[in-house]
Amino acid sequence: MKKKIESYQGAAGGWGAVKSVANAVRKQMDIRQDVIAMFDMNKPEGFDCPGCAWPDPKHSASFDICENGAKAIAWEVTDKQVNASFFAENTVQSLLTWGDHELEAAGRLTQPLKYDDVSDCYKPLSWQQAFDEIGARLQSYSDPNQVEFYTSGRTSNEAAFLYQLFAREYRSNNFPDCSNMCHEPTSVGLAASIGVGKGTVLLEDFEKCDLVICIGHNPGTNHPRMLTSLRALVKRGAKMIAINPLQERGLERFTAPQNPFEMLTNSETQLASAYYNVRIGGDMALLKGMMRLLIERDDAASAAGRPSLLDDEFIQTHTVGFDELRRDVLNSEWKDIERISGLSQTQIAELADAYAAAERTIICYGMGITQHEHGTQNVQQLVNLLLMKGNIGKPGAGICPLRGHSNVQGDRTVGITEKPSAEFLDRLCERYGFTPPHAPGHAAIASMQAICTGQARALICMGGNFALAMPDREASAVPLTQLDLAVHVATKLNRSHLLTARHSYILPVLGRSEIDMQKSGAQAVTVEDSMSMIHASRGVLKPAGVMLKSECAVVAGIAQAALPQSVVAWEYLVEDYDRIRNDIEAVLPEFADYNQRIRHPGGFHLINAAAERRWMTSSGKANFITSKGLLEDPSSAFNSKLVMATVRSHDQYNTTIYGMDDRYRGVFGQRDVVFMSAKQAKICRVKNGERVNLIALTPDGKRSSRRMDRLKVVIYPMADRSLVTYFPESNHMLTLDNHDPLSGIPGYKSIPVELEPSN
């Protein structure tokens, strides 16, 4: 693997994407059979991409797949296997020395495994033995709240519903979830602002908008199929503006792999009409600057007898809190706005002008907005900006959070939450006849804190790589090994499985692409995309191993063993997933006619009250919510210090590392790098390719023991006073205390650091 730093000249997509897909397929898949499966991905009679949550178009192409979707499916359907013979040759201690890419690249898990501390190896056991032993451990705990039930966003609606049902009959609301680490500020912030913790737009709105503002996200890597929608809106004359600390190729220009003309002529579509490199942690200052300009210009228009710049009728009829917001933003000083955002008043005025001129605006955002100590307030400032011009609840306008995992939104909809509503719990009671717990449980940060303090005794993970995804993994690694029980439901080996508890199990499950055969026949599961569309997913491939079970079957097996007197007919439900969906419909009225509607091509849309200008808030209206000050990360407020954000590489999806390249950013064969601007490198007196150390700072600005040594400097077009490193390697630079108090999300995108040359 050749290591090099070399500027990539191509557009996003194009032949570079095609070559990358070909390499992924060649290295992982049985071409004779499995490539055919890609033609069934994201199709009504096929399976949903296990990657991102971008919605499927109503009229999809014959090959509706993106580069990273192809990598995800190649990773899943690999013909490599991790079985008993693999573990006979590799102890857990030896596997801990492997890289995270190497661990998952070893192949698919194909049989139930139990850790044996004498041999330091995982050894096979029968499914029933695994269920019985896990059930016995769960029965032994005096307090159900000693168990943490983690969920990954790849889990289907059906499996997630059964999982929460099991945990609540067990009498726990401990539901740490991957969304706690990515879009929890969306769920919390939007619910408070507009009454719905989800986005308000549909894919069709991109066909009607005048302007799309993309802030804090990187579609070329994290949701590449979005580029097709951005290309289409630019082609018809609408504008897209990008706001991001780094210049990301997927926001700049795109060659559509499905477009023969662009591919054959090497032509491309310019996406962003303007690009603003806001400093890391400067979004709130920028947004308040935009709102201040809009209000001042609206006041001037009013005084001159010109038409209002804002939507006064909408503000008066549909909102509360505007006067308080107005006072706050008008009191924000320009010198502070410019210093914190890194943008001049002139640049911010350009943004405000573009927004003022557009009749219909969509704001798309990702974790660059949410993963801050004030991530919830960040989201709410985006809503404030939209509300000022009535851009919620009309065609071609709205808020568009870009979710990660393909069903992370659906899991929450069907009950994966540590704070369930009383109405939801009452309906569970009515349907099943047991009284679920009402006290709030643990989200991700509280869950890890409970593990670190010894309060938690067991961890069950429905997918994911919990230990690697969390902050401060050095502090949490030993407590994880001191748990009494760890159960990992997974398709591939990862580092979390190697931090073995007293009793550790790995339970292998089917992938999204594989046929799920139950007593009534082949089953479909359902997922919810970022725009609240529910659709079916049906595996088409032969399972990787004869012993694999579905997630639904695994949940039912554990539940039956742990709850011998259960009132739930677990086996009956798993025989036919229509029965699970009937129960979901009974508990959640918005799923009316669930089984009928998922049989329609494309599925159905869950009602979004805010999109219809029905405000399910305590005020009965949309709320302008003021956030005091301009800092979205108070612990980073040291003027002389650098701020570091963690990001994915292009060969990566969440904690899964497909390869060692980051093509669009020009990094190949390596991940031990730190990105900085040429201006910042000059200030720090370092050059491209030199090695440096980063030291994390405490909240009072002192050097901590958390550090990253010998990172290679990569000079990159980006904001100054900002550094970027790769997730999850840099997660340990953040403590469990560095999180948003409203949503609990860790501040992965704003870690104060110092830089020094490496010896």
From Swiss-Prot:
GO terms for molecular function: 4 iron, 4 sulfur cluster binding; formate dehydrogenase (NAD+) activity; molybdenum ion binding. Keywords: 4Fe-4S, Iron, Iron-sulfur, Metal-binding, Molybdenum, Oxidoreductase. The keyword Iron-sulfur applies. Binds 1 [4Fe-4S] cluster. Binds 1 molybdenum-bis(molybdopterin guanine dinucleotide) (Mo-bis-MGD) cofactor per subunit. Induction: By EvgA. [4Fe-4S] cluster binds at C49, C52. It holds the Pfam family Molybdopterin. Its cofactor is [4Fe-4S] cluster; Mo-bis(molybdopterin guanine dinucleotide). CDD domains: MopB_CT_ydeP, MopB_ydeP. InterPro entries: Asp_de-COase-like_dom_sf (IPR009010), MopB_CT_YdeP (IPR037951), Mopterin_OxRdtase (IPR006656), Mopterin_OxRdtse_a_bac (IPR010046), Prok_molybdopt-oxidoreductase (IPR050123), YdeP_MopB (IPR041953). Probably involved in acid resistance. Belongs to the prokaryotic molybdopterin-containing oxidoreductase family. This is Protein YdeP. The lineage of its organism: Bacteria, Pseudomonadati, Pseudomonadota, Gammaproteobacteria, Enterobacterales. The gene is ydeP.
